[in-house]
Amino acid sequence: MDLYPEEKTQSKQSHNSENNMQIFKSENSDGFSSDLMISNDQLKNISKTQLTLEKEKIFKMPNVLSQVMKKAFSRKNEILYCVSTKELSVDIHDATGKVYLPLITKEEINKRLSSLKPEVRKTMSMVHLGAVKILLKAQFRNGIDTPIKIALIDDRINSRRDCLLGAAKGNLAYGKFMFTVYPKFGISLNTQRLNQTLSLIHDFENKNLMNKGDKVMTITYIVGYALTNSHHSIDYQSNATIELEDVFQEIGNVQQCDFCTIQNDECNWAIDIAQNKALLGAKTQSQIGNSLQIGNSASSSNTENELARVSQNIDLLKNKLKEICGE
């Protein structure tokens, strides 16, 4: 299937409709950028586990109706694999950990989607973040002790501990430093702060090396991602969350994000199953809850004990009244 409309392309865009591939390039005094986009039709070797529910195992259906249902509920898996490359020089004033660099933006994604046919473009709803390779290169001579710290975070997450995707510490004394982060998750294209999902923060520790306005280093990064019509379209390779290139092992180290320890110590819990709940996405209204109790919770046990004590007090009071009245 040809995913791209037949129209004239700009001079800086290489378009190969036969292979369903597009290459975008841009270069000026501010830096260089290059983007590659490939359709799923060229990558048939991608395998995944289908999320399916066999209707025949639920309902007794005539053969003809079964065939019609299969056709009606079939869905084409649209996947566009993209590789984005950018290079930019960094002012030493901006290398103090006070600012962030968005590695993927809504504007960039919309530019990629605009090249697709309308019937394909309207189905795209997710972006899957596969890998980010980051190369730092000094704009000064080798041999100067220049420690640097880098962190890639999902700045949509409020917790500073949980927002970390990967962090690395190295030294530009040898001229360059490189590492790779594998986010391996998908997000909706309609998420409010998409531009903050891949935020790069860099802290150049030798802040007195140059003055404000001097370019201290070059950041070159490659982002591999996929645009799809489903959250279930992509499987990721089983890489670590962050890797340091072998040649840089002696001058740097990395810190990957932690996976939380889940403890199954809460066997008694409740869930609100009240009627007339608000529709997902609609304005919520206050309503009286109706909790379904699972197990015997501590709060439930405390309530029962309290009621028992109240009942005993009532019985004692009743007996006292009988004594006073001479009954």
Curated annotation (Swiss-Prot):
Signal peptide segment: none
Short name of any one Pfam family annotated for the protein: MP
GO cellular component: host cell plasmodesma
Stretches of the chain forming a coiled coil according to its record: 297-327
Keyword annotations of the record: Coiled coil, Host cell junction, Host-virus interaction, Transport, Viral movement protein
Keyword Transmembrane on entry: no
Disulfide bonds: none
GO biological-process terms attached to the record: transport of virus in host, cell to cell
Subcellular location(s) of the protein: Host cell junction, Host plasmodesma
Recorded family membership: Belongs to the caulimoviridae movement protein family.
Job description of the protein: Transports viral genome to neighboring plant cells directly through plasmosdesmata, without any budding. The movement protein allows efficient cell to cell propagation, by bypassing the host cell wall barrier. Acts by forming tubules structures that increase the size exclusion limit (SEL) of plasmodesmata, thereby allowing viral ribonucleocapsids to spread directly to neighboring cells.
Subunit structure: Homotrimer, through the coiled-coil domain. Interacts with VAP. May interact (via N-terminus) with host prenylated Rab acceptor protein 1D (PRA1D).
Protein name as annotated: Movement protein
Organism: Cauliflower mosaic virus (strain NY8153)
Lineage: Viruses, Riboviria, Pararnavirae, Artverviricota, Revtraviricetes
